[in-house]
From Swiss-Prot:
Quaternary structure (record): Homotrimer.
Cofactor: a divalent metal cation
The protein's name: 2-C-methyl-D-erythritol 2,4-cyclodiphosphate synthase
Pfam families: YgbB (PF02542)
Function: Involved in the biosynthesis of isopentenyl diphosphate (IPP) and dimethylallyl diphosphate (DMAPP), two major building blocks of isoprenoid compounds. Catalyzes the conversion of 4-diphosphocytidyl-2-C-methyl-D-erythritol 2-phosphate (CDP-ME2P) to 2-C-methyl-D-erythritol 2,4-cyclodiphosphate (ME-CPP) with a corresponding release of cytidine 5-monophosphate (CMP).
Molecular function via GO: 2-C-methyl-D-erythritol 2,4-cyclodiphosphate synthase activity; metal ion binding
Catalyzed reactions per annotation: 4-CDP-2-C-methyl-D-erythritol 2-phosphate = 2-C-methyl-D-erythritol 2,4-cyclic diphosphate + CMP
E.C. number(s) listed in UniProt: 4.6.1.12
Positions with a binding annotation for 4-CDP-2-C-methyl-D-erythritol 2-phosphate: 8-10, 34-35, 56-58, 61-65, 100-106, 132-135, 139, 142
Top-level taxon in the UniProt lineage: Bacteria
Length: 155
């Protein structure tokens, strides 16, 4: 059994779509990044790679590579799944937290879960996604960015 911890953060900017968990969420700002800047999926990828001792997403999908410009993070997550499976690991479970003042994530979590479970070929009870705010504190509380944490267990 191996545990992995992932974290990601992206700045909120105008003229970008807000994509979290593979879901496009209606909002006046989106996350800035080389790919689609999906903080939740990025945190999950880092947790999985960390648990398998395979580095991080920057090692496998560098932002200097034009092939990853605006790419769907779910596509990258599928590649991470292949990497950890190649090493002989399988996912036992993943638990995630999205930290955002706005927009409210509650209404989108089921769709996020469906996207990620489909991508990773997980049963619904193997993935948990929750969301919280920082009560107006810090960069997420001031709506300057959104972050996500993920922890996973591999066998």
């Amino acid at each position: 059994m191996r545990i992995g911890l992932g974290y990601d953060v992206h700045k909120l900017v105008e003229n970008r779509p807000l994509i979290i968990g593979g879901v496009t969420i209606p909002h006046d700002k989106g996350l800035l990044g080389h790919s689609d800047a999906d903080v939740l999926v990025h945190a999950i990828m880092d947790a999985l790679l960390g648990a398998a001792a395979l580095g991080d997403i920057g090692k496998h999908f560098p932002d200097s590579d034009k092939n990853f410009k605006n790419i769907s993070s779910l596509l990258l997550l599928s590649k991470v799944k292949d990497l950890i499976n190649k090493e002989g690991y399988k996912i036992v479970n993943i638990d995630c937290t999205i930290i955002a003042q706005k927009p409210k994530m509650l209404y989108h979590i089921d769709a996020m879960k469906k996207n990620i479970c489909k991508c990773l070929k997980l049963d619904n009870n193997m993935l948990n996604i929750k969301a919280t705010t920082e009560e107006g504190l810090g960069f997420t509380g001031k709506e300057e960015g959104i972050s996500a944490n993920a922890i996973c267990l591999l066998d």
